[in-house]
């Protein structure tokens, strides 16, 4: 039986998820009000249908897939739409937000008497013919969205309340993106001090797995750095203000903010990171 699923918004992940759902028989709606021509084309290419707010609110399931800094505002917008509907959609927050934030979002959606699921996406946007990222779901209604498996998504239920899936996402991202933060900061510092080749050679000898990861992670992170700023602050909040390590992630937020601005400007540090990554590949050949 087909389902109508609304995805807000049609970014890189949202549109790729929409394509996967559409390929497996779901009807996928999105909001295109005020969106750029490029975004509208991306949505159309993914088989998404532009819809008014009323139609969005009538979907069976709504997936919120936006930058973490926009998650609460979107929840408030959705609650204002849903509260007027007799039939309530299941709202799933799939964003990289901490436990406190997702519990706040649960309260907002709950004020509209709609069922809410805490979600966390781990993995890359699905490519045609490729595997789905993992969609971890928790909360009372998590089992109700397991139906998304029938439409091509890898849904994994976390036995726990709202907050459990987000805690998993925060912990995983804190490790994986934290390594990207540490690696990129040290590579730039080493390069500016004339030690790039020596660092690369030593990592190849003693830490080959880390070097292999940096080869991919350094160039891959640059176009995403702006999105990671708010995520690092969410991770800092997940640890808590009194946790000694929380300032590490606040520092990563500032570092990724710098890299995002650098990549858009003179790209000094961005080019150093790309050069280091290219050097890894050249050493292997």
Regions found by a protein language model. Give the residues of each.
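NAD(P)+-binding Rossmann beta1-loop-alpha1 motif at the extreme N-terminus of oxidoreductases
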Residues: 1-58
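Conserved beta-strand segments of alpha/beta enzyme cores
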Residues: 27, 47-49, 90, 115, ...
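Rossmann-like NAD(P)-binding element
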Residues: 51-92, 97
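Helical "substrate-binding/catalytic lid" subdomain
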Residues: 168-269
């Amino acid at each position: 039986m087909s389902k109508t699923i609304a995805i807000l918004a049609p970014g890189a992940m949202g549109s790729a998820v929409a394509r996967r759902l559409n390929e497996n028989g779901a009807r996928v709606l999105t909001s295109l009000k005020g969106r750029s021509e490029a975004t509208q084309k991306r949505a159309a290419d993914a088989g998404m249908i532009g819809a008014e707010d009323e139609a969005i609110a009538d979907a069976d399931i709504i997936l919120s897939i936006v930058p973490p800094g926009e998650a609460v505002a979107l929840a408030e917008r959705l609650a204002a739409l849903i509260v007027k509907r007799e039939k309530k959609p299941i709202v799933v927050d799939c964003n990289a937000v901490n436990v406190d934030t997702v519990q706040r979002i649960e309260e907002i959606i709950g004020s509209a008497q709609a069922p809410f699921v805490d979600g966390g996406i781990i993995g890359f946007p699905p490519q045609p013919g490729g595997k789905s990222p993992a969609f971890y779901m928790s909360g009372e209604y998590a089992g109700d969205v397991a139906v998304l498996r029938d439409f091509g998504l890898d849904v994994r239920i976390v036995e726990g309340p709202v907050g459990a899936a987000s805690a998993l996402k925060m912990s995983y991202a804190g490790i994986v993106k934290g390594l990207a933060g540490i690696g990129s900061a040290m590579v730039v510092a080493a390069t500016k001090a004339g030690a790039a080749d020596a660092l690369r050679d030593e990592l190849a000898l003693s830490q080959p797995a880390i070097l292999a990861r940096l080869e991919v992670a350094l160039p891959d992170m640059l176009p995403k750095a702006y999105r990671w700023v708010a995520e690092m602050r969410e991770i800092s909040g997940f640890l808590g203000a009194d946790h000694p390590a929380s300032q590490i992630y606040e520092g990563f937020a500032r570092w990724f903010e710098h890299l995002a601005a650098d990549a858009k400007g003179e790209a000094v540090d961005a080019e150093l990171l790309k050069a280091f990554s290219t050097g890894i590949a050249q050493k292997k050949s």
